[in-house]
């Protein structure tokens, strides 16, 4: 299961890279705002954490069909997605501070 999940993520990343390459660099996509994209990304991180937590709880109470390796992989995915979110936040704060320090 973990390998299939990784392959799915790789395919999604490749599709996103292709779409990004095809977009015009100077024009913003119509109807897409930074705030909505940020909210969606944070929502995905939250969903990943909730799913991992639920799977861990189900494993603890002995729900059949849930293996320890699946639980550990999902918990690790959750941890990595949170770390990525924190790093993106740090870069955004750094960029904001740099813009605020520019002379007008």
Swiss-Prot record:
Please list the GO biological process terms of this entry. bacterial-type flagellum-dependent cell motility
Q: Which GO terms describe its molecular function?
A: cytoskeletal motor activity; structural molecule activity
Name the principal localization, coarsely classed: other
This protein's GO cellular component annotations are: bacterial-type flagellum basal body
- Cell location: Bacterial flagellum basal body
The UniProt keywords, alphabetically, are: Bacterial flagellum
Annotated Pfam families: FliE
Claim: Transmembrane helix is one of the keywords in the record: no
Question: Is the Transport keyword given for this protein?
Answer: no
**Annotated InterPro entries:** FliE
Family per similarity comment: Belongs to the FliE family.
**UniProt-recorded name of the protein:** Flagellar hook-basal body complex protein FliE
Whose protein is this, by species?
Serratia proteamaculans (strain 568)
Q: What is the lineage of its organism?
A: Bacteria, Pseudomonadati, Pseudomonadota, Gammaproteobacteria, Enterobacterales
